[in-house]
């Protein structure tokens, strides 16, 4: 589970580096990341990849999804709509709409499209043995983020969003491990710990690592 780094804005959104890339370079870079996901993702696991379009390149998410599907072992299983509590209004634009929602794309291996794991519960079993499941909507209403960290990272999501996603795809068990390759300020880890599963994260920004570790220490202190 992760929120993809920028890549399509004129200015960097990380404290450590300028994350802007040309669209072709960005798509190739992302496909390479997904090929690495294929090496570490458990059987029938999922990749929850959050990103939205930008005013600079609104077509990029759709081009990126197509590039991933065409150049990796992954395909789209579902698209979750995340409705944020606040959004960019673009008051100076005569034609751009207010972006209230973002996407969370659910990627699975192509050969596991019929077997990937969720927490959908059986509602009944028919006389022929056919199982019927409680519906789970592809819509989440959640906070934007956990507070202002713009001086370090302008692209964060909320613990609220993380826990709602985990409720559908993860087990609240220590043995269930979530990996966030762009950990940032530690929101994925924070959500995992509150939900009850484990998390491994990587991050190149030393400052953000320190911030994330402090958040984790605070959770341990609170629960002791």
Per-segment meaning from a language model:
Residues 1-211:
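Core catalytic lobe of class I
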């Amino acid at each position: 589970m992760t929120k993809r780094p920028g890549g399509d804005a004129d200015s960097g959104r990380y404290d450590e580096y300028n994350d802007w890339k040309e669209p072709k370079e960005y798509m190739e870079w992302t496909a390479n990341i997904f090929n690495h996901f294929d090496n570490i993702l458990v059987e029938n696991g999922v990749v929850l990849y959050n990103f939205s379009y930008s005013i600079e390149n609104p077509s990029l998410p759709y081009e990126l999804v197509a590039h991933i599907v065409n150049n990796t072992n992954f395909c789209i299983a579902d698209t979750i709509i995340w409705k944020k509590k606040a959004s960019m209004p673009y008051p100076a634009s005569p034609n751009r709409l207010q972006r209230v929602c973002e996407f969370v794309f659910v990627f699975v291996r192509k050969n596991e499209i019929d077997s990937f794991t969720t927490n959908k519960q059986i509602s009944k079993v028919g006389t022929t043995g056919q199982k019927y499941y409680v519906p789970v909507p592809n819509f989440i209403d959640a906070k934007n983020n956990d507070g202002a960290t713009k001086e370090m990272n302008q692209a964060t999501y909320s613990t609220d969003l993380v826990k709602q996603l985990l409720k559908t795809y993860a087990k609240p068990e220590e043995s269930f491990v979530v990996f966030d390759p762009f950990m940032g300020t530690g929101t994925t880890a924070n959500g995992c710990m509150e939900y009850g599963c484990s998390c491994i994260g990587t991050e190149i920004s030393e400052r953000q690592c320190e911030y994330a570790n402090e958040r984790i220490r605070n959770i341990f202190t609170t629960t002791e």
